[in-house]
Amino acid sequence: MKRSFLKSSMLLTPLVFASPIMAQESSESIFDQAPWENEQVLELFSKAWDEGRNYPTKAEFESIGLTFDLEFVRSHSRQRATYKDASKDVVSDINHNRSLWCNLPAGYGKGLGGYPSTQFDQDVFSMWNYTSIFGSWNYGFLQAPGSWVDAAHKNGTRIYGGIKFFEGWNDDGSEGAFLKFISTKNEDGTYKYARAFVNAAAFFGCDGYNYNSEGSTWRDTDWVNFHAEVNRIAKELNIEGFGIGQYTQQPNVSDSNIGYIYGNAEKGKIFDCMLNYSGNKLAYRYVSNSLAAIEKAGLSTDDVYQGQLLVGISSDYWNEMNTETTKQMNICIWGEHDQSRFFQFRVGSSPTNVQENYQLLLEKAFSGANRNPLSRPEISNAWGSFQVADADHANEQLNNSPGFASMFAERTAIGGNLPFETHFNLGNGENYFYNGKVTNGSWYNMSMQDIVPTYRWLVTAKGDMKTFANDIDVRFTHEDAYVGGSCIRLSGATTAGNDIVLYRTALKASAGNVKVNLALKGAK
């Protein structure tokens, strides 16, 4: 007989328990975008620095209309360190140092979508374990929700605080105005707003800034030198993880453009560089020349990413992008402006079913079609349908996907000392549960997302981590929870037994002094 039970909480501890925190609710009406216009916030930080302070005062923020909504933009969560060990990676034949940049929107809708609310059916992206950088594509500078920064940082992922968007064919004057703004110099010739850029990012807790540079400013000397100075200051202040992302229409790195789009030997890396796709597909033909140009310039290839248009994930040049040469190039997936294509293409018969299928779709894209990194289809250029008509066809989505696990190593941000605790919260719920009882209605707050499982899902034969098993199905569900709004459901039957490996950790534990507490429902 098949059996199903819920795992709602797990606590690994030397007999220590930390109480959970109730979710914070808010109304969208408090998020006023007007104070962020015309670089008013950066002006405040520049004024504060001129007066000997790192940050503006409460009164100064209020003078431009930023009041209590300010705290919803701030994050107070430091980025956790990540731990990688190639000898323990599930997939062995990859470039273990290759990185994935998800240049995606955070939440649904421009400007407001990812902020805490009472809206259950919102984007709760959860594949941080393969994501090195997240782009926050649907927000202006410094407006990415603090709740999303919290979630990314818990899982060791860098996340930009928003984007400036410039298009040469749709120039409203903002590109030239912004270039003039950042080019402003002090009497001693230094850039007036460079320190403000660094201090503002530190204050709001994000890891820097992102640009869509499809105009002409990226070739301007002041543009390059200003951002080089911003990076220099951040490095001088030992601000780990700070960076500046930039996408241009350049599909490759060359001797002539490297100093504009990436960096140079004198100043080092200036931008995290997202290269363009070609014909809406991965521009794999340019990779070899790009790598050669980067090496010639004396720079590392660590921060250059070949761009990929996410809507075409199911029929891109994945074989060609995973040769011995091309796998040395990182990849940046983009898609698109107001919502992630993953979130847009979710289907379901009810809000709960939609959310469950959304997580399944993410798992197929990252862990492979079988949702187990040990059992993945071979890398190919045909991953199966990405967009389907309705919930009846959900099983067809990416049903031949090899997953990004076939290209990138998993990472864990779980280290240090015990305790380690999780309630398997995704960051939303149709109800809020506390100790298994319903205490509140629907909610959405990515700050409440727990550290996600390292593996989605590593089900193996008992005692054999090299052999996959499919007797037991594991998935997230919002139908019940112990604390928060979600848990994981295990269902199926096995006579020989299966192991389910959820996390890789680097925890320090004393022999014989570790206790595990689990909250289960429906198990016997």
Positions of the model-derived regions?
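Extra-cytoplasmic beta-strand recognition segments
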Residues: 442, 447, 453-463, 488, ...
